[in-house]
Amino acid sequence: MSGPTRAGFEGSYLGANDRISDLAIMECKICWTPYDPASGDEFRQVLPGTPFTALPEDWHCPNCDAPKAQFIVQSDPGAPALLEQNRVDAQVSALVADFREIWHSKMRDVPLVNKALSIEAVGFRSHEGRGLGVLVSPWFMNLIQLPAAGEDWSGLIPGVKEDLEFPSGLYEFIHNRREMVGGYKACSLYPTMGDFQTQMQAVDLARAVMIELFKAENRAETDRAAEIRASRTAELAALEAAEAEKAETAARAEAMAQPTRRRLISAGLAGEDEGAAE
């Protein structure tokens, strides 16, 4: 049995309202009268700024009275942004599906989870060509970055750290991979979720994060660059010290195994001198 049909419009977009943006300028294919969202429809008292998809179902062409279904796309300045958002939305759906599967199969009975919460993606949008948003779950809240169109992140090594710059500061992301969404990068906002009483409370905070993240005035408070640099410097110093100690030990062992010519020549004499001294 086929599902219910959805009212749409004719033309190259095949009546799919979700494939035109709010900026799309439509025109009647009977009399070629345009509908421009910026102008609205004074005849039907439709306010300027009303998208074609938001017009009442009984709206008709103000010139020839043709129904909405007889309108086609004249131009759509917002189409690229809409297509990009649709791409990000598809990635986000896979991300949410991955973590819902983890929740139901592995995490539901773990004592530390907050069962008042659920898996929800909040505020995802395209930023510099990559999907960015907050993932809320019963056991964590993370800022997530997803790959751009054409980028292959399947080779990301889980656990590798990367610093990403935003207007509010420098943030540390950890690489990861999941079966459905593939590679992604995550910045921990809340490693546990016990402080949240409701899903709405967690979602409201996630929305606030997506606003504050892009405010340069928050940089002094949120910039973790110095902290991250200090941590990395300490890690590198410890690594260099370990390597230096290893090299010194190896050099000492090599020296013992391969004595210098002076030692070989003087070794016997030293023994004789010691015997004479006794």
Swiss-Prot record:
CDD domains listed in its UniProt record: rubredoxin
Cofactor annotation comment: Binds 1 Fe(3+) ion per subunit.
GO molecular function (one): electron transfer activity
Cofactor(s) of this protein: Fe(3+)
One example of a Gene Ontology biological process annotation: alkane catabolic process
Residues covered by the Rubredoxin-like domain: 23-74
Chain segments carrying region Disordered: 250-278
Keyword RNA-binding tagged: no
Similarity annotation: In the C-terminal section; belongs to the HupJ family.
Residues that bind Fe cation: C28, C31, C61, C64
Keywords noted in UniProt: Electron transport, Iron, Metal-binding, Transport
The organism of origin for this protein: Rhodobacter capsulatus
Record protein name field: Probable rubredoxin HupJ
UniProt keyword Lipid biosynthesis, yes or no: no
Pfam families named among the record's database cross-references: NiFe-hyd_HybE (PF11939), Rubredoxin (PF00301)
Tree of life domain: Bacteria
